[in-house]
């Protein structure tokens, strides 16, 4: 691909860069008034969990999953999710939706019910039983948000007509989405450093070590996001996935399946995933960002600034120059930087694995580059996006104002369970 021509076409059609389809998926554990896990079945009022388009279960019968349809703006996706959250809250009686990604109070030898499925969906239950054996039920209760995004079909059509990405729509989608994922994987540590919101776990929580298989406390360093840390929702092994092309990507996943290291692509717990729909003939359809923690300070549990920044980072990842591949060494370095942000994110003087510079210095450099490039392409002409960019620049200069730092101080002051329960009780009354 001629990068210069590619960038020229994007600049000529910069009004399309902010457009696309936006969706959210969110999990919350249902709890009793004392913060213990609710053991009641998934509310019958929502019907068959295997067929409901918006409200279902995740791993556990006690874990509600809410899913928006694809919508034309971030604001509409946020609004739809808040409506779903309200509907669920109104139909769970005296129970509450636990507002934290990390699990609530789990008693010793706590029963954690696996989501029950029947008939044509029975395989979903068998799959969950396998996960429980491999990763432990406690880890499977870790909840969060997935942000789904696809670029505008108009933008795809423009790129197809220009010929800069190939002669078919499949080639265009491959070029665009793999370029974005390669860059996003390198910069994902920055998102976690700015918006991680699982700094502390309930003090009695133990999870199975992915290395030893033994139970261990869920603690690491001066953590900011335990959910995205090595103790959180990860595969037992660190896999090398080849993102240089669709063919190489498929070959690397097929190899893992042949070696019985995973059952299929759905078992890759990656920070960002390329998703495929049949309508797109096997080419990439959208990107799923999987590193967003629940926000205990927001009724719906979704921090709007985190989603807007995620969108800006995806667009930046399309525009940012890169060499078309990620080596295994580069992927490992990106993972170590994620681990640093998640386990040591409260220490802004920590150095990155890429260079002899502090996290705060590198974050400033990237955000300033983002502002320059996104302004050049007109992405920040929109007032909301311009304000969000300024907000992130403010956070990097005032790291104590990051939402995860504020959350950490509140948990330390009030206590893990009391703080989250009080917040959720207030939300459920509004």
For every predicted segment, state its role.
Residues 1-132, 139-143, 309-312:
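Terminal catalytic/cofactor-binding subdomain
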Residues 27, 139-152, 286-293:
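Histidine-centered divalent-metal-coordination microenvironment in nucleic-acid enzymes
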Residues 30-32, 68-70, 101-103, 149-155, ...:
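Short, flexible loop/turn elements at secondary-structure junctions
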Residues 39-42, 78, 111, 159-160, ...:
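Short conserved micro-motifs at the rims of enzyme active sites and ligand-binding pockets
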Residues 79-92, 160-196, 301-326:
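Long, well-ordered alpha-helical scaffolding segments within enzyme catalytic domains
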Residues 106, 117-137, 141, 150-284, ...:
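Loop-rich catalytic cores of soluble enzymes, especially ATP-dependent carboxylate-amine ligases
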Residues 254-354:
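Long, well-ordered mid-to-C-terminal structural blocks that present hydrophobic/aromatic surfaces
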Residues 323-328, 334-430:
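Cationic, histidine-enriched alpha-helical/coil surfaces that engage anionic ligands
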């Amino acid at each position: 691909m001629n990068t210069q021509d590619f960038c020229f076409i994007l600049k000529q059609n910069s009004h399309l860069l902010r457009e696309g389809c936006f969706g959210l998926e969110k999990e919350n554990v249902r709890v009793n008034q004392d913060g213990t896990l609710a053991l009641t079945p998934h509310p019958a009022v929502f019907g068959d969990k295997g067929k409901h388009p918006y409200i279902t279960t995740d791993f556990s019968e006690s874990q509600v999953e809410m899913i928006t349809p694809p919508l034309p703006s971030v604001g509409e996706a946020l609004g739809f999710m808040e409506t779903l959250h309200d509907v669920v809250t109104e139909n769970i009686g005296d129970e509450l939706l636990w507002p934290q990604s990390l699990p609530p109070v789990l008693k010793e030898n706590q029963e954690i019910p696996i989501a029950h499925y029947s008939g044509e969906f029975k395989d979903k239950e068998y799959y969950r039983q396998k996960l429980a054996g491999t990763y432990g039920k406690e880890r499977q209760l870790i909840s969060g948000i997935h942000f789904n995004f696809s670029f505008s079909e108009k933008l795809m059509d423009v790129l197809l007509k220009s010929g800069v990405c190939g002669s078919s729509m499949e080639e265009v989608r491959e070029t665009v989405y793999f370029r974005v994922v390669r860059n996003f994987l390198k910069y994902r540590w920055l998102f976690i450093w700015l918006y991680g919101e699982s700094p502390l776990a309930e003090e009695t929580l133990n999870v199975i070590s992915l290395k030893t298989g033994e139970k261990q406390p869920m603690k690491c360093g001066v953590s900011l996001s335990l959910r995205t840390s090595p103790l959180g929702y990860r595969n037992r092994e660190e896999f090398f996935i080849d993102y240089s092309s669709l063919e190489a990507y498929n070959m690397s996943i097929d190899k893992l399946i042949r070696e019985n290291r995973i059952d299929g692509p759905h078992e890759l717990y990656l920070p960002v995933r390329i998703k495929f729909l049949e309508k797109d003939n096997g080419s990439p359809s959208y990107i799923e960002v999987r590193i967003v923690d629940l926000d205990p300070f927001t009724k719906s549990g979704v921090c709007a600034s985190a989603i807007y920044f995620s969108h800006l980072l995806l667009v930046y990842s399309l525009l940012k120059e890169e060499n078309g591949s990620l080596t295994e060494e580069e992927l490992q370095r990106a993972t170590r930087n994620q681990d640093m942000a998640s386990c040591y994110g409260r220490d802004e003087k920590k150095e990155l694995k890429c260079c002899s510079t502090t996290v705060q210095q590198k974050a400033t450099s990237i955000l300033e580059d983002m502002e320059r490039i996104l302004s050049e392409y007109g992405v920040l002409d929109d007032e909301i996006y311009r304000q969000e960019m300024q907000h992130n620049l403010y956070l990097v200069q005032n790291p104590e104002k990051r939402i995860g730092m504020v959350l950490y101080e509140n948990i330390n002051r009030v206590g893990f369970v009391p703080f989250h329960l009080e917040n959720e009780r207030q939300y459920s009354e509004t």
